[in-house]
């Protein structure tokens, strides 16, 4: 593919607004429901998380509700995904650490005749570029791809701007735990919070959880 082709071919993955839940429990239920829905449509599902603790909680929730899944513990390449998606009759849920995705592959034109897949991310990172890397990975697959991020108001990133006031307002407006919040305004707030956190970043030391990452790398904003 030439440079000009990058601006004239179909490259983008489907990226709906983030789904934001009132509580971690509601988020997990929403994740499980969406995974089930995709499996019912015979789709291959890739579940990602930036932190091991988050991915373990999702795996536990899927297992408890009878949704089979498996961990992929090594680096996941574009070729790996193609082989897994194209396995006849093998519709599965693969759990992967987001950091194991390659970031050095070029985007490919989407071939609509190929089997598609869904990518669900169980959190957003404090550093926007790490989320963008997942989107970039989806663009390298060359097949139909839907990418959805799930968050809760209790996520450390969300606490940087939401606080208890937003939770209380939503409850007064009749917002139930079974319904997710969507909207461009919240998306802008998330992006702004990520930019603010990145400006105070001292390091990028690995961590098992979002809370630990914040304490290690941006202690001034630890919640």
Where are these regions (language model features)?
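Short acidic, S/G/P-rich loop/turn micro-motifs used as interaction or catalytic elements
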Residues: 52-56, 74-79, 99-106, 123-130, ...
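Conserved segment of the helicase C-terminal RecA-like domain
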Residues: 122, 126, 130-181
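A short, basic N-terminal segment
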Residues: 1-14
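A generic structural motif
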Residues: 69-82, 96-97, 146-154, 176-188
């Amino acid at each position: 593919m030439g440079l000009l082709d990058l601006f004239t071919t179909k490259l983008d993955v489907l990226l709906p607004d983030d789904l934001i839940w009132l509580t971690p429990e509601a988020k997990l239920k929403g994740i499980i429901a969406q995974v089930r829905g995709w499996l019912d449509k015979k789709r291959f599902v890739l579940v990602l998380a930036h932190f091991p603790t988050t991915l373990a909680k999702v795996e536990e929730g899927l297992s408890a509700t009878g949704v089979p899944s498996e961990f992929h513990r090594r680096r996941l390449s574009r070729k790996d995904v193609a082989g897994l998606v194209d396995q006849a009759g093998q519709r599965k849920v693969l759990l992967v650490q987001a950091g194991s995705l390659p970031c050095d592959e070029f985007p490919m034109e989407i071939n609509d005749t190929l089997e598609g897949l869904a990518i669900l991310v169980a959190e957003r990172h404090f550093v926007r570029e790490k989320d963008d890397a997942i989107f970039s990975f989806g663009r390298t697959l060359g097949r139909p791809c839907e990418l959805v991020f799930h968050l809760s108001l209790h996520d450390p990133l969300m606490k940087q701007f939401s606080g208890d006031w937003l939770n209380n307002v939503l409850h007064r407006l009749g917002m139930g735990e079974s319904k997710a919040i969507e909207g461009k305004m919240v998306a802008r707030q998330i992006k702004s919070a990520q930019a603010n956190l990145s400006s105070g970043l001292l390091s990028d030391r690995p961590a098992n959880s979002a809370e630990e990452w914040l304490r290690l790398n941006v202690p001034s904003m630890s919640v």
